[in-house]
Amino acid sequence: KHHSVASHPELAARSFLISSFGKTYHVTGWKVGYVAAPPSLTAEFRKVHQFNVFTVNTPMQFGLASYLEDASHYLNLPAFYQSKRDFFRNGLAKTKFKLLPTPGTYFQCVDYSGINIAQAKLPEEEFCKWLTSAIGVAAIPVSAFYADTAESNVIRFCFAKEEATLNAALQRLQSL
């Protein structure tokens, strides 16, 4: 089950909630993010932010404001993403990828070392490049997010996609 740190008062009082409308609200091309925090934290955040970001285009701001007026759009998101996660995990369970626990996100991490093909011996970044170019499914090596880039054979897939896209990806991944 997905829970926000903002739902826990002690965490909310000392946390920045940083997110993206794109993935959170399933409008992935929009590239608009947001930060929510208590006033004392946002005051400090704005000191840095004002020199890094100028503005977001006006039509996107109006579109998102209109979208947020209907609470059902965001109140139904946990069930929406849980359904996508379950669908994608069930499909991946029919592959040789080892599914890893990844709660509270729209990414599914997998270990590819059990796949019986020569490419499974590639380092994560090279495996992801091969997977994208040869199989047509994009993945990101999790080592890209760590200072210690020791290979772990773990990559992540995003399941914040249309069902047809997920189906096509699963068919390709199941062929490995």
Language-model features: where?
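PLP-dependent class I/II
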Residues: K1-L176
